[in-house]
Amino acid sequence: MTATPAAPQGALLPNPAKERLLAGETVLGMNVRVIRSGDIARIAKTTGHDFIFIDMQHSLYTVETIGHIAQVALAIGVTPMVRVRGVDDPDTSVLLDNGVTGIVFPDVNSAAEAKRAVDRCRYPPVGRRSVGGGYPMFDYRPTPLVDAVAALDSAVLTVCMIETREGLENVEAIAAVDRVDVLHVGSNDLLAALGLPGQFGCPQHLAALDRVIAAAKAHGKIAGVGGDRNLARQVEFIRKGMRFVTTNSEIAFMLAEGGRVTSELRKALA
C-alpha cells in the first residue's frame, strides 16, 4: 500500500476568472440564489460563464451547501464567488477554507471598510485570515503550510461593492486600498440610495459607472457592474471598461425560457 502523495511544492490553486482579468479579459458571472447543488456550476460553465456569484446576502444558503457547490465549480474551471453579508461577516474565513476563491463584500462605504474586507481574505502579514489545514482545494493532500498559504492568497479575488452614496463619494479612496481587486457597482442598491430605484441607464447611473471605472483605472483595479440586466446597456458598460459583469440570475434565466416556451404553446393551443 502506498502513502497518500503530498501536494507538489509550490502548489497552485487556479482561479480562472482572476487569471482572465489579469490577462486583460472580461469575465461574466451568473448570479445564483436558489439552486442548491453543484449542477448549477456545470450549467454556468455550459452557458459560457466564467464565475458563479453565490448570493449569501439575499438567500437562505448554508455554509455547507455553498461549500459543496464551490468544490464542484473548482473542479470544472468555474470560479466560485460568494457575496457575504458584510465586511465583518464571520463566515468569510470558513467559506474560503472550503472551496470558495472569491468574496464579494456588499455596501463598502470607506477605505477603512475596504481594508477590513482585505483583512478577511488575506493571511498575515497583509491581512488577518486564520491559517487552517487539510484544504479541499488540494484534495486534502498534505501540503506544506508555506505553499498552501501562498497558493490560497494568490488565488483569492476580493470584490468591494459600491452601492451607496457614501461608497460612491469615497470610491477613489476605496480603490486605493491595497489588495482590493474589483470595484463592483450594485446598480439596484445604488439607484435606490440615489432616490432613483429601477432607473437603469439614467444620467446619474451612467455618471456613477464612469466614476467607478475612472477610479479603478487610476489605481490598477478592475471595474464591475451588476443589477442592470439590459443586454444593450451591458454591452455598452463593457465597452466603457467594465470587466467583471454579472449577466443575470439562474432564477431569471429559468423564468425567461420557461415563460417563452409555455407562452408559445398557449398561443398554439388558442
Q: Residues of each region from the PLM?
A:
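N-terminal amphipathic alpha-helix/helix-capping segment at the start of soluble metabolic enzymes
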Residues: 1-31, 142-154, 210-218
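Alpha-helix-loop-beta-strand connector modules within alpha/beta enzyme cores
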Residues: 16, 63-97, 121-127, 150-153, ...
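Active-site mouth loops of central-metabolism enzymes
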Residues: 21-38, 80-85, 156-169, 222-228
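Short, well-ordered coil/turn segments that N-cap beta-strands
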Residues: 23-28, 49-50, 74-80, 100-101, ...
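Glycine-rich, proline-tolerant flexible connector loops at the mouths of alpha/beta enzymes
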Residues: 40-41, 45-67, 187-203
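Catalytic cores of alpha/beta
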Residues: 42, 82, 87-101, 105, ...
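C-terminal helical cap(s) of enzyme catalytic domains, especially alpha/beta-barrels
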Residues: 69, 111-127, 251-270
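Conserved anion-binding
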Residues: 90, 102-178, 189
